[in-house]
Amino acid sequence: MTAFHSLNVSASALTAQRVRMDVVSSNLANMDTTRAKQVNGEWVPYRRKMVSLQSKGESFSSILNSQMSGSGNAGNGVKVSKITEDDSDFNLVYDPTDPDANAEGYVQKPNVDPLKEMVDLVSSTRSYEANVTAMNATKGMLMKALEIGK
């Protein structure tokens, strides 16, 4: 594994975590949106979105097996495989004054839990910071290698 390969792995992780932070930000921004899109002629609330990540190239088990046997490469980084909607039920809130309230006075609110979103945001931020640290360490090693020839 070359130093430039490790930079590419960290860069792919930075991109994936940035997408994850963008999705969490969108979830938090739309946590009160009761009219996100029309389904069968009726407005439905915003649905929480989730990011799925996967490794680029080979699967983890095949990389592990090749490393255990002393051959192969250490992986190619990570990528966003898909962004899916959370199919859990919407939250029902009693507010008969809301224009979106049903006949009983309940309003369907998005299935976004701000606590869950903040945990995801902190997790992706920590992962982002760890990858920046890894990139800086690689950069430091490359700079030291360049100084050897002086």
UniProtKB/Swiss-Prot annotation:
A Pfam family annotated for this UniProt entry? Flg_bb_rod
InterPro entries (alphabetical) = Flag_bb_rod_N (IPR001444), Flagellar_basal_body_rod_CS (IPR019776), Flg_bb/hook_C_dom (IPR010930), FlgC (IPR006299)
Give the primary localization class. other
Q: Which GO terms describe its cellular component?
A: bacterial-type flagellum; bacterial-type flagellum basal body, rod
Q: Which UniProt keywords apply?
A: Bacterial flagellum
Where does this polypeptide localize?
A: Bacterial flagellum basal body
For this chain's UniProt record, which GO biological process terms are given? Answer: bacterial-type flagellum assembly; bacterial-type flagellum-dependent swarming motility
Specify the superkingdom: Bacteria
Family recorded in the similarity comment: Belongs to the flagella basal body rod proteins family.
Q: Which PANTHER family match?
A: FLAGELLAR BASAL-BODY ROD PROTEIN FLGC (PTHR30435:SF2), FLAGELLAR PROTEIN (PTHR30435)
**Record's subunit section:** The basal body constitutes a major portion of the flagellar organelle and consists of four rings (L,P,S, and M) mounted on a central rod. The rod consists of about 26 subunits of FlgG in the distal portion, and FlgB, FlgC and FlgF are thought to build up the proximal portion of the rod with about 6 subunits each.
Protein name (Swiss-Prot/TrEMBL) = Flagellar basal-body rod protein FlgC
Source species of the chain: Bacillus subtilis (strain 168)
Organism lineage:
Bacteria, Bacillati, Bacillota, Bacilli, Bacillales
